[in-house]
Amino acid sequence: MAPRLQLEKAAWRWAEAVRPEDITHEHIELAYRIAVSACKRGACRRNCKGNPNCLVGIGEQSWLGEIDENTFHNIDDPNSERRDKNTFVGLTNLGATCYVNTFLQVWFHNLELRRALYRFQNSRAEGHNTDSDYEPRTICEHLQYLFALLQNSNRRYIDPSGLVKALGLDTGQQQDAQEFSKLFLSLLEDTLSKQKDPNLQNVIQQQFCGQFSYVTVCNKCGRESPLPSRFYELELNIQGHKNLTECVTEFLKEEKLDGDNRYYCESCQSKQNATRRIKLQSLPRTLNFQLMRFVFDRQSGHKKKLNTFISFPEVLDMEPFLEGREEKCTYELSAVLIHRGVSAYSGHYIAHVRDAHTNDWYKFNDEEIEKMEGKKLQLGIEEDIAETAKSQTRKPKCSKGYHCSRNAYMLVYKQQTEEINQTESPVDVPAFLQKLVEQDNRKFEEWCSEMSDMRKQSVDKGKAKHEEVKELYELLPAEDGQSYEFVPLEWLKKWLDDSTAIKEIDNSQFLCTHGKLHPDKIGEAKRISLKAADLLFSRYGGGPRLDRSSLCRDCVTQRCRVIRLKNQLNEDYREVTNLAKSALKSEESGFWIGKASLRSWRQLALDQLEEDEEETKHNNSKINGEKSSPGTKADGVKGDSEDGDGEEMKNFNEDILCYHGGLSILENDRRLVSAEVWNKLRMYFPKAPEFTQDHDPCQQCMRLEREGKENEALNRMMANEQKSSLLNLFQEKNRPTLQKWPQDTDILYIVPLYFVEEWKKFIRRPAKGNPVSNVGNSILLCPHGGFMFTYDSMLQGDAQHIALLWPAEWEVISKMFLVDQVISICRIHDKTQDNGNVQYQTHPDLCRECREGFIFQQQRDMREYTQATVYVRKVIDKKRMIKESAPEFSVSGSDVEDEKEEPKLDGEKDPDFSQTEGGAKRQKLNDTVSLPTAVVTTTSKSGIRRSTRHRKLRGEKALIVSANQTLKDLKIQIMHAFSVAPFDQNLSIDGRCLKDDSATLGSLGVIPESIICLKADEPIADYAAMDDVYQVCMPEEGFKGTGLLGH
């Protein structure tokens, strides 16, 4: 099928030769494309929107032919949630609770612990009525019920949210898994100790509790001092070790106590050098080794993960580590807990657990459980996950019977026994718990039944829809000569899209202002047979129904008229263009027309026609209940001129109107055209402003122009006179300075630097600005009339507010400008002393009270600022840490020179370099006096004024800070600006290091406009740690506020 635009042109091609009053019904059907051939199936890749008869590519492909029943299923098979035979049950990850799930699976597979928990007295569960849901309350009740579900539930995985909620854990915050294990076992032991059953009271100690002693031996007298202690796991340092044996050996090694760490011996009654070691005395049935992978890094101030490979045996002989014990003490590996990830603040926890009955190994990964092939533990896949491009370490070879891991953080060993005892025997679920499990299983089966019924309903519904589509789709095409109707294309697509609900047919969107089918909407509608329309409307309802009588003659006539007008416009445009090229005859009367209007008149005429059409559409939208979209021509927004140079015209010939509504005095913006040209243009713009050749320009504009030229001439004369009289001041040559007082005068005059800068601007551009008429020296005085600056302060920072004048210059200024207050500084020689001591006196005198207040205000602003700017300069080496850029010479304070690009430092480029404008700030003198913004300047000994405005350098960025924010907050800002982690930042200011992260910037002496040097440490080998910087910056609260701490 031809493209949409070609169909559009073909539908209206007849309008060029047919007058509006000669339109027939055949022309109307051509405009609505009734006779356009329908597309055959397979001929179109997508539906032809320009063809109302094209019914291909609207979603029918999926319904024609045979359809598999599975395609009708919009609900997952509930049996996929069912537990397979001889498999274990998983646990749902509630967000970041994978660390909880791993320990629950390990403790569930401890048969003695599970058997003991089943004996826990639970009167609420024993007396529970199965008509209502059981809700455990205590931790033991939750764990007991959870273990029963893990053992006999029909579900593939269960939800541990009851236990997690009872513990008060934050499901979105990953916590320290090792700390959770300790706290939970401690809480469980405390709860079970209150039971009457002695076996239940001591089950945690029997399973997990061992004993060792800290033995201290005095080097002088040899006295041993044992200090017994219990343990539930052995925390082993892995740094610098390769296998578990080395870690245990280091744990038990002897430690020397000397120097300040000497031991007080009760026998010697004094501090003596001594040795201390840990002596294992008894080991539990379940021996837990906590491998200390997550350690505190003193350099960064945060935790980090040690990705050290540690090998460990399947069978562990602990006899060599027990003193005075000859019986066998052999343990067999029963669980390995894994942390996937390279960071201590993120990652994923899984558990490898050995089944006590079959000795098969299983991997527990939240809801997913995978049985290992064979009888051996397989960790290879888990070790590959943590590898990164920067941290690949070759895995060491393991001997037979050993395993190696860089991610294992806990090893669980079970004591071997020679005979088969109750540990290997099945653990039966008590009757009262089994009843609760069966209640949950019934609920699960009911859910599965409901889901199956819903799946069957969706299949039945899909089959019915399939038959309906096959029946109706064949009836949709309207044959030639048959009655037909129009329905929305989008509705047909939704009818054929099984995923969306089908609404009633809505044809109101297609209505024109005459209540019929708008010809512009034909691309959004499809022509179907009357029989198909009757069936669709009877089943789905809706309206209004649009048939052959709904074709709008009025709209077609209006469009025909517009098309003919556009064609006539093109002919007139060519004629006007040719006539405008001819020169106007001397005896011929002409008309003034704007050059922009002459360039754009065709587009303006087209816009008027389109506005009429858009107005019709706008009214049509109101009838259909639609809103006109902003930015359309109906809203008065016109497009760019295709004939002009892009200028936007509101009305024709208004570009030669002045502000007063008369003929503009700008002759370059208008030209004369002949009466023939003007008459043709006036046909399209009857209301356009008309000016004949002899029409006078606006008198008010001419008077203002004369006055402006006179004022401009006066300003130029004034500027030349002032410049010649004060040439050195303008060029900043031969300027007096306070550092080296001129020898030929004892008095200098003072004016605000702001006055000098504004005066220079006028001298440079006298025609663009207003002349400076007065010298506002009162701005340098306090409310009492006293001067605000001392001689010493004007040598330093206060030089940014003043300019010094020679007496001759002051005499000129006092004549040319109005001066509100004379300010001078005198040099006074002390003749009473032989050393020629010199004093300096200002007039008016210094107001000491206001001066002290001003200094106090400055100091307070330095300490209590908000939203101030500081500059962070990233440096590469130590030389650049202390290097400061030389001040840049400024021969004048013009705006042009302020905009010049600043010179860059040579040396190594930094990718974080950016250049932005610097600026000086207004400084307040007190509550009523303020100094205007000016370029900060100092005066050198040579008399050349140099700018001290901040110059941004390579590798420097401006940050907005407040005095009360901490150094840590600043480091986070720097992290965002430079992509340098806070723990890799070394900050200094004026050679002084900034170290205390908790200190405020005000207390550290960081003031507005400070330059802070950033020296970044070498990037860490593990780039993925940057992803956890945000978590690092959050305060670590652990399990504060949870049930694990008794809250």
UniProtKB/Swiss-Prot annotation:
The USP domain, residue ranges: 89-416
Annotated catalytic residues: 98 (nucleophile), 348 (proton acceptor)
Observed effect of gene inactivation: At 5 dpf, knockdown results in significantly reduced auditory startle response to white noise at 600 and 800 Hz. Mutants have less developed vestibuloacoustic neurons innervating the ear bases, less organized and fewer statoacoustic neurons, show a significant delay in the development of primary motor neurons and are smaller than the wild-type counterpart.
Biased composition range(s): Polar residues: 621-631
EC class name: hydrolase
Residue ranges occupied by any DUSP domain in the UniProt entry: 457-551, 567-697, 717-830
UniProt biased composition (Basic and acidic residues): 635-647, 901-912
Protein keywords: Cytoplasm, Hydrolase, Nucleus, Protease, Repeat, Thiol protease, Ubl conjugation pathway
Region described as Disordered: 609-647, 887-928
Keyword Transport belongs to the record: no
Source organism superkingdom: Eukaryota
Subcellular localization: Cytoplasm; Nucleus
Keyword Isomerase: no
Catalytic activity, as annotated: Thiol-dependent hydrolysis of ester, thioester, amide, peptide and isopeptide bonds formed by the C-terminal Gly of ubiquitin (a 76-residue protein attached to proteins as an intracellular targeting signal)
GO molecular function, one term: cysteine-type endopeptidase activity
Domain Ubiquitin-like positions: 961-1012
GO CC annotation terms, alphabetical: cytosol; nucleus
UniProt EC number: 3.4.19.12
Any one GO BP annotation for this protein: proteolysis
Primary location recorded for the protein, binned into one broad class: cytoplasm
Similarity annotation: Belongs to the peptidase C19 family.
Function: Recognizes and hydrolyzes the peptide bond at the C-terminal Gly of ubiquitin. Involved in the processing of poly-ubiquitin precursors as well as that of ubiquitinated proteins.
Name of the protein in question: Ubiquitin carboxyl-terminal hydrolase 48
Gene name for this UniProt entry: usp48
